[in-house]
């Protein structure tokens, strides 16, 4: 692989990489506002300027400047190197680049920063970006100067509603055009553009349009400053109080990697941020997915219920014991859920097929929906493939409706509340449902046990491409809910069976042993001792 | 009628001489804060004295490791809370050593003057309280009167009488007030007058002298072996003072003497402290003479020093600077440092480790009292019970500093 030198450090690069991308691949950040690894490079912010050394024997690129000489008391002609944007110049074999080590580069960053903040409003205390703002970071890293301009800053429109999700503040904008390029290049809907020039420059929505569609949140996500904010997160939380968990989006079978930001003090999830994964979602997420963090709180089942009346877990388990007394295993059906994690499904599968000895395995989940060829998948369940791997024989819920109608099944133990078909006919069976969210199956249940959502426990999900991904626990369990695999062990105990698991890692080990499903959450194997 | 004990030998009349166990503290007025001494007494003689600290425990160092570097200042105020300014300056010097910062000359003189005021307050409290515990209430009131004068100056400068939180990384919270020099020049002679008045009353008092002289004596070698520093060490005749031995700030540019004792007993410790008050007066006078009336008090280091408040409200640059320093804390370069200064009771050391973030990775404090209190049982064993009060009082153990 060819290499070049950045500040004396030899870095490999792939042919065609720009300097900034080659450095980024090695985990070195050259400061930038307008460059984004997932977008084209306009080279308009000038923050990534670097000093490229001339090849041996070549004349250096230089600028003639007048510089104030305090000793002489006058401006004297000098030369300084012509800096070039690292986001636009391709790395070349043997190239020598100076960034942090060049006095001229540091000076350029300082001056670019001063220009960008020239008309910036004093908004940090009320700005949602505060705490994760590039303007703040780079001022500390490269600025550290005080304001020299004494004029009134230029005022521009604030609080401009761009569409149903995004609000724009032109005064905070640094005109990097990341949002413009995202809409044009990734969302393929060039609805944003710029108008005017210089200090009147601002971002606008195409006349007659709104900023809408399925990827509007990403314009806020790529915004390096607080110019674009989402109506959803605006003024809701201060980012330095939030903690983050590495989650997997539950909105569809794509399984986008995300950061789930939550406030541990109020035990509430506040937002998703895409987590970079070249193989799954690159840098992006869709609007539906970005808003799906709300499902950690909305439509949740938080207490056990018997025939729709809230009760204690003990009484609910007693009721299960009563309604299951003397039932033949052959007439019991278990319903796995494509919404729930591998661990939850495995617990129910093992309980149903091994302990109860039932052969009737079905699968439920959410209905198919909108899809596109960017990220959004038709299948709206996070773990359909995972259920397939556990129980390839699982029959669709439609067949359970038929089987209940024909009295081949009288008792049902179901995971998850959602159903892809109208399940009203299941009312004829005695149903126990363990679910995190309200749905048709939770309403039909004789006994309903609350489960934790993906945000409250660690779980493995297999996306449509067959990739196993672990979603970490963020908030503490809400209400009296507990992970479904724990409730299933309790149901088993109530019916006189002993589950083989008491801990999550036991389920994971068992899935590996029985089904050969690799244990994603297992730490790397220790190096054997000599 | 014959006496009952007619047949008995005289020796058999004595009561069985089993040692008596007695708890002194942790809640005892002479136990300065909360220390417990478990005594084994034979009559009134202490056979064994087991000194136990730990009744005042706040998890001090761990608390310091949870906020930003600047948020440590209020905590170190509560080390030796009779001279918080010395702790503030000591911590500031430690962090500055880690950053490679040197504060402007004006600030160095200011820190010296304030620190020596705090030392006067510390010594007045120790000697005054010791006299009071031996029944001499009047000198205590005079000494505290003098201490009030010190605290009036500190209040004028910092806004607080006791816990000032006045130190800053790279400077002080505020420049000296216009009255500072005048206040010092007016108060210092009065303080020394009061000290002399108290001295005349105590040092001609037979009872006072008898209770101090030759009580709780320790040799210089033993004191060094125990890790003693400060006035307690100097009372044994070892002239080790960090201000002389390893000068910091501008201590190498001022004239002052290091008072030492000869016997290392309680009286020597009492006298060394009184001597140091006079030396502190000399240092303060020289410091305020040489401190400029204007000029910067803080380093020119935007990465650690807060911007001016009016600028924070009106310009984005200062807002960002303020935000970064308050919300994330000043980023101190990764590394470790041991920095030590002469505190009220001896070597006050800070061992700091930075991982380059805005929060200290490790704050280890070497409080002088910890080592000194460690030698208490050695001083007490074999002495009479009543010797505890002057001996313990003369060590000036401060609970907040002994928090380990």
Region locations from a protein language model:
Chain A
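Acidic, Ser/Thr-rich low-complexity intrinsically disordered segments
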Residues: 520-530
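Non-catalytic alpha/beta scaffold blocks inside enzyme catalytic domains
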Residues: 326, 351, 355-361, 365-520
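A basic, amphipathic helix-loop patch mediating RNA/tRNA/ribosome contacts
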Residues: 19-53
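A short, compositionally biased
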Residues: 1-2, 43-48, 253-256, 523
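Intrinsically disordered, low-complexity Ser/Thr- and acidic-rich flexible linkers and loops
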Residues: 58-77
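N-terminal export/assembly segments and adjacent metallocofactor-ligating motifs
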Residues: 2-12, 16, 24, 52-57, ...
